[in-house]
Amino acid sequence: MSFLPIDLRMIGKIRLFYINKTSISHSITTKNISLIKNKDNLRYLLEILDITKESKKYLEKENLVKFAKMIDKSWELKKRYQESFIDYKECNSLIDYAKNNGAYCGKLLGAGMRGFVMIIGPENKLNNITDKIKYRSLSPKFVMTNQPIIKL
């Protein structure tokens, strides 16, 4: 594993939106495990793994736009992989609105189908998006230490 230092200016370009719902992650995980047995579904997961490795390179170079494009690509694959048992309508509405208003990408965070949606984009665009939607937003905050922030 290696550590990535993060330029804190990038943090202002990330916003989390709480969609105020919960799910039972155990049942989602069980369904995911059963899907892996299908070779087409396994292909999606391997493709997401490749995208993750490529994303790390863009993050190391602090190229947030290309990093966000990789996040977007992996999110689209994940939705196809899980479309048989997860309804992403609410998340997609928020992500589509954000992308149509200048965000680079959006992605659901956490297990299951509810919780936080991460949106990445220019700070001024995120501020406008935040002002116009109904969800509570959070900006990530970090405490400065001598330790790297992300461990991969």
Where is each model-derived feature located?
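C-terminal nucleotide
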Residues: 1-107, 118-152
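Long, low-complexity C-terminal extensions of enzymes
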Residues: 111-112
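Conserved glycine-rich beta-strand-loop-beta hairpin in the small C-terminal domain of fold type I
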Residues: 115
